[in-house]
From Swiss-Prot:
Region (Disordered) residue spans: 395-437, 513-617
Origin species: Methanosarcina mazei (strain ATCC BAA-159 / DSM 3647 / Goe1 / Go1 / JCM 11833 / OCM 88)
Enzyme Commission number(s) of this protein: 3.1.-.-
Binding site for Mn(2+) 1: 12, 14, 53, 191
Family of the protein in this entry: Belongs to the MRE11/RAD32 family.
Biased composition (Low complexity): 395-432, 549-559
Protein name: DNA double-strand break repair protein Mre11
Basic and acidic residues composition bias: residue spans: 560-583
Segments of skewed composition (Polar residues): 529-547
Residue stretches in coiled coil: none
Native organism taxonomy: Archaea, Methanobacteriati, Methanobacteriota, Stenosarchaea group, Methanomicrobia
Length: 617
């Protein structure tokens, strides 16, 4: 080498970290970084190398970015280059913050192409997820022919490397697979200073510039790498940082535990101001302590941040209750993916979303292209090809079960006095049976429509000649027919005095039923049923006091039915309207108000359309 080269090695500055939710602690991290840069300018080093985690978050605030650019500009003024790699905390899917600083001339991003500082070539590898370490590609490193023969080569990485604690990567493996001989490997991610030799290469961690946790009790530092013709030297420089004070107060079971704790705290009054204080309370656990009072007392003594921990052990409980083991996050994700049993498409989507090589703006496009490629590769004509569809947990309903349950039941509701007629059987006759039991006139109740049977059960019941069964729901909506039948059976005050009177009542009932049916005109789109071979007949039931409708013992001739209908011709509908005269045994409908919307035809007809006469009975 022509001359001695000095490079400042730092890492894990974690700028923007608001530790313990304290703005003062956020400023402390910037002050530590400023100290490093100030020392670099004062020592006139040849370059500053940052080994990852410049920021604590991949989304630093605008204030953090402005302060960082302000600090880096001091190096630019001093003509000292700043080189860095991307750490795991700040890694983004697309453009990195180092790329922005490089465009501004404030920094350079290290990679497989070397950055030259005199006769020293510096390479870099960004933080690699643990799951991708076995697949890392060592090819692509550039070794320019213009490099001098005695050129020294440095590699900068952000990984936990073996032989450090909890390693992710074997440093010896990396050095062996590199296409060049590395004189030193400058590392980040481990926050303590380390320096070891692996083979012929030096491996060193500079440590973090500020304490990221209470466990980091050692002084913070950075390193100076000195390269010359005689060899390589690594020296450590510490950084002054805010004091972390650890106090242990023991309670021995007296009545005044607070006095014991405050007495112990008072022994450190000179160290408490502007310090981050950690107080552990140990000893007897019988007394109840208010930690808020202890924190307020320490803050009153000038502490910046106070953390109180109850380290007392309750009687009968061993000190080690549970052993906690922390698993690798990447391994946990892999186990969760195996548990989910994703298909090929799901695995492709997961891989694209979590890949750092796919920019966020191209996730949708890349996912679509990969899935289309998967679909095109599938041979749908393959006889072994099969699409699995989850089976519903709902048990199928057997239509015959409803019918069988009805047939097995010995009791039939009084309202089930109307025999069902299949719409597909025009030759069947609708027969209205006489109720088996009739209540006294004073005990008459309003007849409620039972829950209608389904169409399947309705058809099956007719085919099996079962007991009476209500038709489907469309019959329940027939307001006019239901109202007429209900009011006929409720009219108990009309009692015939003679068979002649009873006969007139039967005729009136027949007329009322015919009047209701005649409302269904061809204009409404209703298809009337053809003439049945077994017409409806009416019989007299003088024992019950009113006329009931029952199946005839003998079928009357059409002439008799015609004579009965002509007897009440004056009560037949004229021009589609009922007569205003009240038929015997039929409630007066003239007093019932009709809604205006019904007159104008704004609402649907009460009688369903396109059903035959059997549906209405």
């Amino acid at each position: 080498m022509d001359r001695e080269i000095r490079i400042l090695h730092t890492a894990d500055t974690h700028l923007g970290y608001r530790q313990y939710h304290s703005e003062v602690r956020r400023q402390d991290f910037f002050k530590a970084f400023e100290t490093v840069i100030k020392d670099a300018v004062d020592m006139q080093v040849d370059a500053v190398v940052h080994a990852g985690d410049l920021f604590d978050s991949r989304n630093p605030t605008l204030e953090d970015l402005l302060e960082t650019m302000n600090v880096l500009s001091r190096l630019k003024v001093a003509n000292i280059p700043f080189f860095g790699i991307v750490g795991n905390h700040e890694s983004k899917q697309s453009t990195q913050w180092l790329d922005l600083f490089e465009e501004m001339g404030l920094a350079g991003r290290l990679g497989k192409a070397p950055k030259m500082v005199g006769d020293v070539a510096i390479y870099g590898i960004d933080s690699v997820p643990k799951s991708k370490i076995p697949l890392f590609d060592y090819s692509g490193f550039e070794i320019p022919e213009s490099l001098p023969e005695n050129c020294r080569k440095l590699l900068v990485m952000h990984q936990i490397m073996q032989p450090s604690p909890f390693p992710d990567w074997d440093c010896a493996e990396v050095i062996e697979n590199l296409p060049f001989k590395a004189d030193a490997v400058l590392l980040g991610d481990y926050h303590e200073y380390e320096k070891i030799k692996v083979g012929e290469s030096w491996v060193t961690y500079s440590g973090s510039t500020e304490r990221n946790s209470a466990s980091e009790k050692e002084p913070r530092s950075y390193s100076i790498i000195t390269l010359s013709g005689e060899g390589l030297e690594i020296s450590r420089r510490t950084i002054p940082t805010r004091n972390f004070l650890f106090i242990t107060a023991k309670v021995d079971g007296e009545e005044k535990p607070f006095e014991q704790i405050f007495s112990t705290v008072n022994e450190h009054l000179e160290e408490i101001p502007e310090s981050v204080v950690f107080l552990d309370v140990s000893g007897d656990s019988s007394s109840v302590l208010s930690f808020s009072e202890i924190e307020e007392y320490l803050l009153s003594k000038g502490a910046l941040v106070v953390k109180v921990k109850d380290a007392r052990v309750k009687e009968g409980i061993p000190e080690e209750v549970i052993k906690v083991a922390f698993h690798d996050p990447d391994r946990a994700v892999a186990e969760e993916l195996r548990r989910m049993s994703l298909n090929d498409g799901g695995l492709i989507v997961d891989e694209v979303i979590r890949s750092p090589d796919v920019p966020r703006s191209r996730v949708d496009e890349e996912t679509e292209n990969r899935l289309l490629g998967l679909i095109e590769a599938i041979d749908f004509k393959d006889p072994d090809f099969m699409i699995k569809i989850p089976v519903s947990h709902v048990s199928p309903v057997d239509p015959s079960s409803s019918v069988s349950s009805i047939e097995s039941s010995g009791s039939v509701s009084p309202i089930d006095s109307v025999s069902t007629v299949s719409p597909s059987s025009p030759s069947s006759s609708a027969i209205i049976k006489e109720p088996e039991e009739l209540k006294p006139p004073g005990a008459a109740e309003e007849i409620e429509n039972p829950k209608p049977a389904g169409v399947t059960e309705f058809t099956a019941a007719v085919a099996a000649k079962s007991e009476t069964l209500m038709p489907p729901v469309r019959i329940q909506r027939s307001e006019s027919l239901n109202e007429s039948l209900n009011k006929i059976f409720e009219k108990h005050d009309v009692v015939p005095e003679s068979p002649e009177t009873a006969g007139s009542i039967a005729g009136s009932v027949e007329t009322a039923v015919e009047d209701e049916i005649s409302k269904v005109t061809p204009d409404s789109g209703v298809i009337t049923a053809p003439q049945s071979s077994s017409p409806v007949s009416f019989s007299d039931n003088s024992q019950t006091g009113f006329s009931a409708i029952s199946p005839p013992e003998s079928i009357p001739s059409p002439e008799i039915l015609k004579e009965n209908s002509e007897a009440d011709a004056d009560e037949k509908p004229v021009d589609g309207k009922l007569s205003e005269e009240k038929p015997v045994g039929v409630p007066d409908k003239a007093t019932k108000t009709v809604k205006q919307s019904h007159r104008k035809g704004k609402e649907k007809s009460a009688v369903p359309r396109q059903y035959n006469l059997g549906d209405y009975l």
